[in-house]
Every structure is written in C-alpha cells, then in structure tokens.
C-alpha cells in the first residue's frame, strides 16, 4: 500500500474499538484526511498528544481501503494545551475546526490549511481577542469558499459605498435601492469592524468597543449559518455565553 507524508492540523477525533481513534485532519497537500491512529488511546502510545484537536503535525500514513492509517506523527505546532486553558479560546477553536471540516474535502487547498493553522496559532498566543480571531477566520474562510462578503460597495448592484444596511442573504451591505423592506441598519463602526476583520486590519478591530464587537459577531454568525446551511454548534455555544455574560454584566 502506498505510503505518503504531509503536514496536517487535527480537526476532530472519535473512538474506534478499545484503543484506537479515527482522526480527521486538514492537510497541506491532500485536503481532508480521515485516518486510523492505532493504539493512540493507550497510556504508552507512541503518538502521545500529537494527534489531539488543534495540533499540527508532520504525519506519515499509508493508504487503506476505506481509511488511511497513521504510522508516524511529529509535532509542528503544539497549540492544543494553550488553547484549552481559556474557555473562550477553546470554544472559538472548536468553531474554527468545525467550519474547516464543513468547507473542505479531499481536494487540496493550501490557503484553507494555512488560514486555519494561522488562526489556531494566533489563538494559542493570545495575539487578539478570541472573538475577533474567530470572526476574522470565518469571514476569510467563507471568502475562500467563494462567498466573499462586501462591506463597502453594494453586494447586489455594486453601487459604491459606504452603505449601512446589511442583508446576509445578499452577501453584505446593500444600497437603499437594493435593500429589501425591513433590512437592518447597522452602525458605521460595526461596518468598519467587519471590513477590518475581513482584511486583517487589526488596529481597527482591537479599537472596537464591546457593543460593536457583539453586533459584528452576530452578523458574522448569521452569515456563516446562511452559507453553511446550519449553524456551527460551537459558535452557538459561544453566542449563548456572550448573551449570558452581557445579561449578568
């Protein structure tokens, strides 16, 4: 059976038998891979924590009939432990890998791989707030999938902006002529934040107030849900937690 190597980030795992796991990974060259890691649940496993979610590893696999088999794994990026120490970061990371799992397949996508690894690295280092990092990742990953939003010109007719009404079903901001009845009007600061998250304008993003961040997150969640057809479970948990903290504050 052919043997191959690749870099991969672990998206999720689930138990198989007494000691094995099926590991779902997004790889640099082979797209999404599902493979068996034999004996990984044993205390003395040679894989250790290298095949846990959010970890990036150099893996060697051989092709099986239905599932490939991991034979070696060496750590490239150990992000899991640092992310797990913070609940908001952990929830954000779960939403990221869930989105990546939904949006990728066996076709190689280097940009998808690099975007996810970069976002997990940023979370583990605490470079930006978890919510900002997640929202930026979701907007970018959806753009790579072909659903790039517009936060400047009208997403329907292209009329130059800025515009203040947002319709997620139409792809972002819309001009007065294209806005359907009842379209929500959004603060200019929120539009600016969404644009910054999409383009990596972190200075603008970090300067946004909590209410602006909350409004932007709600729109990003709605946009992701519209295009993914059903909501991300982890994103729903994060939104619920935000509402609870806002109510208690």
Curated annotation (Swiss-Prot):
GO terms for cellular component: bacterial nucleoid. Disulfide bonds: none annotated. The keyword DNA repair applies. GO terms for biological process: DNA recombination; double-strand break repair. The keyword DNA damage applies. Keywords: DNA damage, DNA recombination, DNA repair. Belongs to the RecO family. NCBIfam families: reco. Involved in DNA repair and RecF pathway recombination. PANTHER family: DNA REPAIR PROTEIN RECO (PTHR33991:SF1). This is DNA repair protein RecO. It comes from Leifsonia xyli subsp. xyli (strain CTCB07). The lineage of its organism: Bacteria, Bacillati, Actinomycetota, Actinomycetes, Micrococcales. The gene is recO.
